[in-house]
């Protein structure tokens, strides 16, 4: 066996172990909330030692963040051939569903309790997605679907904050009707009319 084959086998084993651990986090969160989540239980469910988990993640909050990222890896892709309104509606609906799942709810707890974790989530997860949304906004301006003279950063903050607000304070997942109305009202001041 060549060194390259050995390396590939080790890489594959590492990837499989990580997947088992992340699956174990999902399983555990289906039974207990974040405060009762333990590395011992996750290790037992995944069939690995605690040291294996700590080799890749320092804290259980890191595990929850990684699990959320894995669960939503392909969920938030934008469709650049479709309208800004369509894309924002789809993103907010998918975010609502993702945050209402066990890993999403645990992540909300982590962010409320840990400023550093919240900052990491913002930098590593939200900023790249926001950058994609900025590109879509620019494309929508170029297509003359929306006006350019608007504070889009604040608009995005308001849209996403409304979803978090519904989930955290009202313990409800915004439905399609709510999201459609939210996006329509938010975009109304900047939509280009055919007569413009």
Give the location of each predicted region:
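C-terminal peripheral helix-coil segments that are non-catalytic and often amphipathic
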Residues: 1-8, 86, 90, 97, ...
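Short hydrophobic/aromatic patch on the recognition helix
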Residues: 47-57
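Amphipathic alpha-helical packing segments from all-alpha helical-bundle domains
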Residues: 97, 118-143, 153-154
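Hydrophobic alpha-helical segments that form the core
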Residues: 148-168, 180-186
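Basic, helix-initiating cap at the start of DNA-binding domains
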Residues: 1-32, 36-45, 62
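Short, basic, alpha-helical segments at the C-terminal edge of helix-turn-helix-like DNA-binding modules
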Residues: 68-75
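Hydrophobic alpha-helical connector segments
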Residues: 76-102, 155
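Amphipathic alpha-helical segments used for helix-helix packing
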Residues: 67-68, 98-120
């Amino acid at each position: 066996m060549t060194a390259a084959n050995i390396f590939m086998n080790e890489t594959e084993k590492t990837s499989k172990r990580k997947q088992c651990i992340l699956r174990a986090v999902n399983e555990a969160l289906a039974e207990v909330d974040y405060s009762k989540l333990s590395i011992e239980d996750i290790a037992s469910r995944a069939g690995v030692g605690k040291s294996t988990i700590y080799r890749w993640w320092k804290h259980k909050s890191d595990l929850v963040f990684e699990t959320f990222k894995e669960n939503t890896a392909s969920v938030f892709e934008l469709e650049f051939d479709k309208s800004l309104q369509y894309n924002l509606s789809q993103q907010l609906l998918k975010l609502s569903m993702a945050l209402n799942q066990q890993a999403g709810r645990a992540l909300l707890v982590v962010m409320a309790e840990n400023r550093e974790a919240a900052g990491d989530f913002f930098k590593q997860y939200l900023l790249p997605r926001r950058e994609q949304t900025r590109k879509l906004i620019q494309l929508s301006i170029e297509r003359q679907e929306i006006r350019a003279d608007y504070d889009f950063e604040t608009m995005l903050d308001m849209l996403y904050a409304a979803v978090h607000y519904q989930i955290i304070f009202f313990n409800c997942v915004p439905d399609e009707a709510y999201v459609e109305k939210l996006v329509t009202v938010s975009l109304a001041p900047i939509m280009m009319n055919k007569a413009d």
